[in-house]
C-alpha cells in the first residue's frame, strides 16, 4: 500500500539515503586497470565485449554498474566499498602484475569483495577468472605452423610482470619445439596490449633484420 501511494504521488526513492540505511548500494564497480604508459590509446576491444556482458548481467540482477579507468589508486577498498559507492569490485586488466597483486593482497586482508579477470595462478589472492592462455597459444602456433610458417615472431612481455603473456609464450614455444623448430629468443619483443605498442614492437623487430614469416 505504501508503494502504491508513493507511485500515485510520483515519489522517487532517494537511493543514497536508502543505501546508507541498508548498507547496500546495489552498485558494482568495474575498474579497467590500464597499462602504465598506454596514455590515450584505444581500449582493448576484448574489454569492450566484456563490458557489454557485465553491464547486461548486473542490470538483469537489479544492480547498477559504475565504470572507472584506473592507474594510480592505492586503496580501491576505501575508494569504493568504504565510501559506500559500491558493494563489490570487478577488475579488468591489471597493468604491472607485480604491483597489482600486492594491492589484491591488501584487499583480501581488509575483507573487500572483489573478483579479477586475468591470470589464474596458484596462491593468488581473491577470486580470479581467466583464459587458458597456454593451450590457446599452443593451438594458435600450431595453426601457423600448419600454414608452413617457421620463423614466427612473438610480441609481448613474457616476464613475471605479465603472466598471461608468459603463459602464451610458453604454449607458443611448446608448439615450435614439438615441430622440431628451435625457439629464437631474438624474435620475441616485449610489448604492451595496445595497437600503438604493437606497431612500435614490430618496428623494433624489423630493425633487428632477422627473417620472420609470421607474427604472434
Predicted segments with their positions:
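Short beta-strand elements in bilobed, periplasmic/extracellular small-molecule ligand-binding domains
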Residues: 58-69, 153, 169, 173-197
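N-terminal helix-turn-helix DNA-binding module of bacterial transcription factors
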Residues: 1-26
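Short beta-strands and strand-loop turn motifs
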Residues: 117-118, 152-156
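Hydrophobic alpha-helical segments within soluble ligand-binding/sensing domains
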Residues: 129-154, 170, 174, 195-204
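Short, intrinsically disordered, charge-balanced linker/junction segments flanking boundaries
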Residues: 1-3, 189, 206-216
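Conserved beta-strand elements of the Class I
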Residues: 29, 153-155, 213-216
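Alpha-helical structural signal in soluble globular domains
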Residues: 5, 53-57, 106, 167-179, ...
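Alpha-helical recognition/docking segments in bacterial nutrient-uptake
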Residues: 23-142, 146, 205-207, 211
Amino acid at each position: 500500500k505504501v508503494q502504491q501511494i508513493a507511485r500515485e504521488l510520483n515519489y522517487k526513492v532517494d537511493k543514497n539515503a536508502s543505501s546508507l540505511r541498508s548498507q547496500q548500494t546495489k552498485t558494482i564497480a568495474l575498474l579497467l586497470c590500464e597499462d602504465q604508459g598506454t596514455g590515450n590509446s584505444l581500449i582493448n576491444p576484448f574489454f569492450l565485449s566484456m563490458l557489454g556482458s557485465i553491464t547486461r548481467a548486473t542490470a538483469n540482477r537489479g544492480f547498477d554498474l559504475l565504470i572507472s579507468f584506473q592507474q594510480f589508486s592505492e586503496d580501491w577498498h576505501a575508494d569504493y566499498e568504504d565510501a559506500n559507492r559500491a558493494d563489490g569490485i570487478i577488475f579488468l586488466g591489471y597493468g604491472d602484475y607485480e604491483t597489482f597483486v600486492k594491492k589484491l593482497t591488501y584487499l583480501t586482508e581488509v575483507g573487500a569483495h572483489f573478483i579479477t579477470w586475468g591470470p589464474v595462478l596458484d596462491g593468488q589472492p581473491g577470486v580470479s577468472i581467466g583464459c587458458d592462455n597456454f593451450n590457446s597459444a599452443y593451438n594458435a602456433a600450431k595453426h601457423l605452423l600448419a600454414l608452413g610458417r617457421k620463423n614466427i615472431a612473438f610480441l609481448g612481455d613474457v616476464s613475471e610482470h605479465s603472466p598471461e603473456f608468459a603463459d602464451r609464450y610458453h604454449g607458443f614455444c611448446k608448439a615450435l619445439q614439438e615441430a622440431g623448430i628451435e625457439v629464437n629468443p631474438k624474435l620475441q619483443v616485449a610489448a604492451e596490449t595496445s595497437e600503438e605498442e604493437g606497431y612500435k614492437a614490430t618496428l623494433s623487430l624489423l630493425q633487428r633484420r632477422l627473417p620472420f614469416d609470421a607474427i604472434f
